[in-house]
Amino acid sequence: MTSSSANGRSHDRTVVTAAVLNYEAGNVRSAQRALLRAGAQAFITGDGDEAAAADLLVVPGVGHFGQCVRHFREAGFEDLVRRRLAEGRPLLGICVGMQILYAGSDEDPGAEGLAMLPGHVRRLPGDVVVPHMGWDVVRVVRDDPAVAGLDGRRCYFTHSYYADPADDAHVVAVCDYGPGFPCVVRTGPALGLQFHPEKSSDVGARMLHDLVAAVADGRAGAEVTSVRASRRVGGGHTS
């Protein structure tokens, strides 16, 4: 599947194709349905060539870090994603689907992540209830076309670990649960979400709609440099 870029708006905008990678990691159908509602021509695929042609590549994920990264490699998607990022084409990682793009995780220290994004996946500190489940506020700290209107809204979380980018400039939004943690990260064309947009009702639907619109407008892979507020996330990069 292919689609051309477009600068139109609303019904004149070229339809965005979105490939949801199927690698035995959980929420592929709910992610597909949410993207369809957001206006994308979304499809689930285990075929790398089919996925490579899509405008937006989606890596969902629910479960254990080590198992997910193993299934991802066994499905043959590692080279696909590496090429995607090298070409500067849009990619969305959701929950563990975002976490496996990093080098490693406290959840399974022996498992090698894909190491495509700089940073590490850390466990939420022991002085908060883990897992973190339910609705919580997202605070945007850097402008990004994919998160317009998300600041101060509640999204749905279910996790015990979070991605901690090596560079704070990659943090787009944070959640202030406990000492706080990054919940939206951006590294070039890759956007990662710790919350589940497909479970976040109207807020998640709006976020995915904005992302699809940004992909259609050719802006989704742009660097974001406008700092809106201090990050104010505790924990730093200590193990």
Predicted regions and their residues:
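Extreme N-terminal starter segment of soluble prokaryotic enzymes
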Residues: 13-19
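C-terminal and late-domain segments of enzyme folds
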Residues: 163-239
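Structural signature of beta-strand start/N-cap positions in the alpha/beta core
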Residues: 41, 56, 90-92, 154
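Short acidic low-complexity segments
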Residues: 42-53
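Short acidic/histidine-rich motifs immediately flanking catalytic phosphotransfer sites
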Residues: 51-61
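Pocket-forming structural segment of enzyme catalytic cores
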Residues: 103-179
